[in-house]
Regions:
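Alpha-helical transmembrane segments of multi-pass membrane transport proteins
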Residues: 1-428
Length: 428
């Protein structure tokens, strides 16, 4: 059954079938041709896979990100980031990172962050003399903060599967996200200084004040979301609803940049993305069911434990596995398949689930940055028109190195659980 499922999945992907349908076809084929399980289990597993109130947060944050893009909120975020950062050497590239960090604090998606912020900043970076390869690498690296800085779609999936607090996971991603963002900014500064481009200029307080006044309502959006979650005012799902309502009010009544027709178009495009994401999660649960029927979970765990029983060693094994999977499959498809297998093993070893959740999110992001088919890498390459050889070897390896360093720090040091324990108290 496993062989039929995997072969069917590979064939579907080779023929260009969208990942959601590829997973659904492969899972259905595996059950039909390789088992005696009744076919209604396909529908049953699909709906059980998405039957969680917490999963409502995902389509809500997708809609919030779409509203931000169409309503002029993302543009104002970029303008504000530019006002406070563009005076630095390498300021245009640093602005890309800073704006991505702010946008990530609402969207929860790496792909949405790359598209929304990269679409604005990439032309400016190219005008300033940055190479297409460097521009693609920085856009991908900065956009990948979407699943790390709260709210994070990947962490919502982790929380739904494991039952761990999504709010704690969100807060646990703040420090790693800021470390990565600051590291990328330093790399931008070094690159610009070494190549003598993007000289920056004089810091102008009046420009910053004007940008701040114009973007204050946009900047309040991530503050309300993160502050509300950290303060216990609302759950992750409620935060998604607040983000949608707030973004809509600001876009329609404050900035007056969204008409009724625009809103309908936003709903239409966001609905397509919502449906695809939920289909990926639902069909992935069929894979988990097949793995359970075949006893693959225990076989994989036994194999890993035969290599090492050290939690640190197991972390690195899982990271390597997640990176390989992430090169070929979106994290939303990989997590529902892999987590039910891996999570009980780490829980039995007493590993902190805040640490495990953040490391999983970082690992899937790393897979999205890694060739041959990392989704973040290809999105940014499409935006810049760069080629693989110009992007990966000179620049993307440094971005990947930064991500790896932060993952190692999160494994060796209690970085992911420090802030959640400070805000919510130690997890029981």
């Amino acid at each position: 059954m496993i062989q039929i499922t995997i072969i069917t999945l590979i064939c579907c992907l080779l023929f260009g079938v969208p990942i959601a349908f590829a997973i659904g076809i492969a899972g259905t084929a595996g059950l039909y041709f390789g088992s005696t399980a009744p076919m209604f289990m396909v529908v049953k597993q699909f709906f059980e896979g998405i039957n969680s109130f917490s999963y409502m947060a995902i389509p809500l944050f997708i809609l919030a990100g779409a509203i931000m893009g169409k309503g002029g909120i993302s543009k104002r975020i970029v303008n504000f980031a530019s006002a406070i950062l563009s005076w630095l050497r390498g300021g245009t590239a640093i602005t890309t990172v800073g704006a991505s960090m702010i946008f990530a604090a609402v969207s929860g998606s790496g792909a949405a962050t790359i598209s929304a912020i990269g679409g604005i900043t990439v032309p400016e970076m190219l005008k300033k003399g940055y190479s297409r390869g460097f521009t693609a690498a920085i856009s991908a690296g900065a956009g990948s903060l979407g699943p790390i800085i709260p709210p994070s779609v990947d962490m919502i999936v982790f929380g739904c599967i494991t039952g761990f607090s999504i709010s704690r996971l969100f807060v646990g991603g703040i420090i790693p996200g800021f470390i990565i963002g600051l590291s990328l900014m330093i790399y931008c500064y070094i690159y610009a200084k070494k190549r003598n481009i993007d000289y920056g200029g004089k810091f102008r307080g009046k420009v910053v004040w004007a940008a701040f006044k114009d973007s204050i309502w946009a900047l309040l959006m991530p503050i309300i979301i993160i502050g509300g979650v950290m303060g216990g005012a609302f759950t992750a799902t409620e935060a998604g609803a607040v983000a949608c309502v707030y973004g809509l009010i600001v876009s329609v009544f404050v900035y007056k940049s969204m008409s009724f027709k625009d809103f309908i178009n936003v709903l239409r495009s966001a609905s397509v993305n919502m449906a695809m994401v939920m289909m990926i999660i639902g069909f992935s649960s069929i894979f988990s069911y097949i793995f359970a029927l075949e006893g693959m979970g225990q076989k994989i765990v036994d194999f890993m434990l035969s290599i090492t029983t050290s939690p640190t060693g197991l972390f690195f094994l899982v990271i390597a596995f997640m990176v390989v999977i992430g090169c070929f499959m979106e994290s939303l498809a990989a997590l529902p398949i892999i987590l039910p297998i891996i999570y009980p093993m780490f829980a039995s070893l007493g590993v902190n689930l805040n640490q495990l959740g953040v490391v999983f999110a970082l690992s899937t992001v790393l897979g999205g940055l890694t060739p041959p088919v990392g989704i973040y890498l290809f999105l940014s390459m499409n935006l810049t028109g760069s080629k693989m050889r110009d992007t990966v070897l000179p620049h993307m390896l440094i971005v990947i190195g930064i991500m790896l360093l932060v993952i190692v720090l999160c494994i060796l040091l209690p970085i992911p659980q420090f802030l959640p324990d400070l805000v919510f108290g130690a997890a029981t």
